[in-house]
Regions:
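Short, electropositive alpha-helical surface patch
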Residues: 57, 84-101, 120, 124-126, ...
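Acidic/histidine-rich helix-loop elements
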Residues: 1-15, 37-48, 75-87, 127-139, ...
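Conserved beta-sheet core of the metallophosphoesterase superfamily
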Residues: 169-262
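Solvent-exposed loop/turn segments at secondary-structure junctions
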Residues: 6, 36-39, 71-75, 111, ...
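Membrane-embedded segments
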Residues: 1-104
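Binuclear metal-dependent hydrolase catalytic cores centered on His/Asp/Glu-rich metal-binding motifs
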Residues: 79-80, 87-91, 101-102, 114-166, ...
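Short, well-ordered beta-strand micro-motif
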Residues: 112, 120, 226-228, 263-265
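Active-site neighborhood of phospho(di)ester-bond hydrolases with catalytic His/Asp-centered motifs
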Residues: 1-2, 30-35, 64-71, 104-108, ...
Length: 285
């Protein structure tokens, strides 16, 4: 699950409903590829910060939680004389999250146990072209991936499932990117909010395109990819909060866009491929 965009509009009722749904699904791992918070402003108050940490703590009691970093997790609404991108401030929140039991926040880091290997790569503000709004930059993506420690990308454990959590999927199907990530089984992303595609159309239209992207591009690709072919590695997860606090008054439309989760089920039987069964869950909370 992805893109919670934690803010005042994400009520305790919604958080409890998410925890209840996770308990029903009973996963071994919860993978969250970024945008846990809407902006850093939303966790300035200690009460709100603790509300978020308590939610993650409860998730960690259900399954191993692995998070990566999204663009909203590093951003604060700009004030006079200050930039909106405040990575150092975000790092303090990341450390508080890492202090929770069974919760692992990966900021260009790796999680590994007896079953899985998981990279959490952070696309930096430079990738998002912070000085020009959200304009994603593929050369920066390639440069940042190449600058990661070689051991993060190559000679990976063959018998373990290998995941790369990368918030934005925009360029993840490009040949150059796929080559750098060739040893991974799956890329898990969010960011696109299912291309703001209503659930009924999401189920009926067999395409990776959505209606609109965060950069306001129409019919964007890689908006809602669901591993339709054996060669496909990219799973783009829809949002827990489609219209977030930052884009008032559109957040009133959340009533028509249920929260989304994707459950990946893997078989222990020998098969042609490790391609998992994907179950889509839509809930209005």
């Amino acid at each position: 699950m992805s893109d919670l965009h934690f803010s005042y509009q994400v009520t305790n009722q919604k958080l409890q409903a998410i925890i209840k749904q996770v308990k029903t699904l009973a996963p071994d791992y919860i993978l969250m590829p970024g945008d846990l918070i809407d902006t850093l402003d939303m966790v300035d108050k200690n009460s709100e910060r603790q509300r978020l940490l308590n939610f993650l703590k409860k998730l960690g009691q259900q399954a191993t939680v692995i998070l990566s970093v999204g663009n909203h997790d590093m951003y604060r609404k700009p004030t006079e004389g200050q930039t909106g991108w405040q990575y150092e401030v975000a790092s303090k929140l990341f450390d508080e999250i890492r202090a929770l039991d069974n919760v692992f926040l990966l900021d260009n880091q790796v999680y590994e146990d007896e079953n899985i290997y998981c990279l959490g790569y952070t696309q930096s503000p430079k990738y998002y072209r912070a000085d020009k709004g959200i304009v994603e930059d593929m050369p920066v993506l390639l440069s940042e991936l190449e600058s990661l420690p070689e051991k993060y990308l190559t000679h990976l454990p063959e018998k373990k499932l290998k995941f790369a959590l990368i918030h934005s999927p925009v360029y993840l199907n490009q040949p150059e990117v796929k080559y750098l990530l060739r040893e991974f089984d799956y890329f898990i992303s969010g960011h696109m909010h299912n291309g703001v595609m209503p659930p009924v159309l999401d189920e009926l239209i067999n395409s990776s395109r959505g209606l609109i992207s965060p950069t306001k591009k129409w019919a964007p690709e890689n908006s809602r990819n669901t591993l339709r072919t054996y060669a496909d590695k990219l799973l783009v997860v829809g949002a827990l909060t489609t219209f977030h606090e930052c884009i008032k008054p559109f957040n009133k439309l959340n009533a028509f866009f249920p929260s989304y989760m994707a459950l990946m089920e893997f078989t222990t039987k020998k098969t042609y491929s490790r391609k998992p069964y994907i179950k889509h869950i839509y809930k209005n909370w």
